[in-house]
């Protein structure tokens, strides 16, 4: 992820900093930015870098990101000028290695963004994302807007490994040439020169000096996501069954199996809801029909489709769900 040098009073009164963040598509970059904006109570605009093109070509003009922020601020210019703009998929506008035609969606977009990042007055339409003679325009100064750029940066790991392996193989105390080949946290060692090699132009990186990476979610993290947040999905289902005076529990092994299934889908925490809904559908339909049921326990066997949930009748011991229905 790349962060920009923007001056917000809530960021320790430090000079403004644009930020550059990198991480897998399932590492939670967008959710992190949304949470930041909500905690700071500032407007947020999210856009995809792949939709941006140089002015005059098909696609969204670069200034459209400021228009989206103005809309998020309910057309309040002062509010928008203290907001956050998150540009995702920034790796997709890397400079093309070999091209003879004008790169209107790559290097040209990076060049066009320089004006926004360095802080300038931008004329943007009110209530629209594209300029039109019939739409009134206002001036938004981008100097205090926090720009955050993020992307997955495929193949960046190989660039970092090549640099580190080359450095470690030089000198009397040289290490093995493949020392970093199995380093799982290789992205944490990223430097600006790696991003330049990837295809980000020096002028663009110069305005995004803060670079950090996000690790992919692990099974343990996914289990915590299911259990710990105030609006965790498990708590939502527990609350729904509480309305029928039924207690819902999940065995730790069951949660681990759900996390494993989510890891297999390779979409991060997004997969958790669909997986849990698959197993809870019948339970949410059948349990309210029987007023004698006091609790339901989701087991690993049920998640692995080797058994059924365990239920406890009021005043009785736990029974498999099919026995209870009988």
Residue ranges of predicted features:
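Pre-Walker A adenine-sensing motif
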Residues: 2-15
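AAA+ P-loop NTPase nucleotide-binding core of proteostasis motors
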Residues: 20-45, 49-58, 62-326
């Amino acid at each position: 992820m790349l962060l920009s040098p923007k001056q917000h009073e809530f960021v320790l009164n430090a000079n403004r900093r644009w930020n550059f963040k990198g991480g897998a598509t399932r590492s939670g970059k967008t959710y992190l930015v949304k949470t930041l904006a909500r905690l700071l109570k500032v407007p947020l605009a999210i856009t995809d870098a792949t939709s941006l093109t140089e002015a005059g070509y098909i696609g969204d003009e670069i200034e459209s990101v400021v228009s989206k922020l103005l809309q998020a601020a309910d057309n309040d210019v002062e509010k928008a000028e203290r907001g956050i703009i998150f540009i995702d998929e920034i790796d997709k506008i890397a400079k093309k290695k070999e091209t003879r035609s004008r790169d209107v969606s790559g290097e040209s977009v990076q060049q066009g963004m320089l004006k926004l990042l360095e802080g300038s007055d931008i004329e943007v339409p009110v209530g629209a994302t594209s300029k039109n003679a019939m739409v009134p325009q206002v001036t938004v100064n981008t100097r205090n807007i926090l720009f955050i750029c993020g992307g997955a940066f495929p193949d960046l790991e190989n660039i970092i490994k090549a640099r580190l392996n080359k450095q470690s193989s030089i000198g009397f105390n040289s290490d093995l040439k493949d020392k970093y080949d199995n380093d799982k946290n290789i992205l944490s060692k990223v430097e600006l020169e790696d991003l330049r090699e990837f295809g980000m132009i020096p002028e663009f990186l110069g305005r995004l000096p803060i670079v950090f990476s996000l690790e992919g979610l692990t099974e343990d993290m996914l289990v915590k996501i299911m259990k710990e947040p105030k609006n965790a999905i498990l708590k939502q289902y527990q609350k729904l069954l509480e309305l029928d005076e039924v207690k819902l529990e999940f065995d730790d092994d069951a949660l681990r199996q759900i996390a494993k299934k989510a890891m297999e889908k390779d979409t991060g925490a997004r997969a958790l809801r669909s997986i849990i809904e698959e197993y809870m559908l019948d339970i949410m339909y059948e349990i309210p029909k029987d007023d004698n049921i006091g609790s339901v326990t989701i087991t690993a066997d049920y998640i692995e489709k080797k058994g059924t949930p365990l239920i406890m009748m009021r005043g009785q011991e736990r029974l498999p769900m099919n026995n209870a229905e009988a």
